[in-house]
């Protein structure tokens, strides 16, 4: 079977896009360059902030997302992936703009939770992802219960790490409040934490956070490798 071309609709943000590409590369079974899937990346940093648009009337990110989707299709992508959880609120609009499939990161995460036998997970995500309920609607279609931070302070700590830590590239950011938010979710019964913003997997590495987790970026990478006709490891 010939390999299919992966199109990454990226730039939301650039570090998350790089993290996804690295995971595709690291998790492909390949003894030579030619065994890897071909990947086209549009790291479109003109895409407006998704949370600001969803919750605060900010600039609509969809026009630029659609430009990127069409651009990737025009240069030969066989399917698309979007390394941004909050952007999946616009998944349907992106799908309508192209004639190629778009993998769904949150659905792939749901499937991974079910496969691991997780009964209760805690969600770490942007205000836009949490308040629009996109994870709740997708995850709770299965048997997995989903917890979100139960205090404004804990959710603010998550947003702080995403925007002022990971996105800002602050290597010495104080993550004490974020650690507390993670520990509160685990104390309430979460077996794992869903890293429901693509800035969080790099942040977990950067700040050496070792809580049990499911990484949606990794699940998207694995799904893309398989969809491209390659083997995963």
Model-derived segments and their meaning:
Residues 1-233:
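Non-catalytic structural scaffold of enzyme domains
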């Amino acid at each position: 079977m010939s390999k299919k071309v992966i199109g990454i609709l990226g730039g939301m943000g650039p570090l998350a896009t790089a993290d996804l590409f690295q995971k595709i590369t690291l998790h492909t079974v390949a003894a030579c360059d030619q065994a890897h899937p071909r990947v086209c990346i549009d790291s479109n940093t003109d895409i407006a902030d998704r949370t600001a648009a969803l919750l605060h009337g900010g600039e609509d990110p969809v026009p630029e997302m659609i430009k990127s989707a069409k651009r990737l299709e025009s240069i030969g992508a066989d399917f698309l992936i979007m390394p941004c959880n909050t952007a999946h609120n616009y998944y349907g609009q992106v799908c309508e703009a192209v004639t190629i499939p778009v993998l769904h990161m949150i659905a792939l995460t749901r499937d991974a939770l079910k496969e691991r036998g997780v009964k209760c997970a805690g969600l770490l995500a942007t205000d836009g992802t949490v308040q629009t309920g996109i994870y709740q609607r997708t995850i709770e279609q299965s048997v997995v219960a989903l917890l979100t931070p139960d205090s404004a302070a804990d959710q603010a700590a998550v947003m702080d790490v995403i925007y002022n830590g990971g996105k800002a590239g602050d290597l010495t950011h104080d993550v004490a409040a974020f650690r507390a938010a993670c520990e509160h979710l685990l104390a309430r019964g979460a077996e794992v934490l869903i890293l429901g913003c693509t800035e969080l997997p790099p942040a977990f590495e950067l700040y050496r956070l070792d809580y049990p987790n499911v990484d949606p970026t990794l699940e998207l990478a694995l799904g893309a490798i398989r969809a491209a006709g390659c083997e995963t490891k």
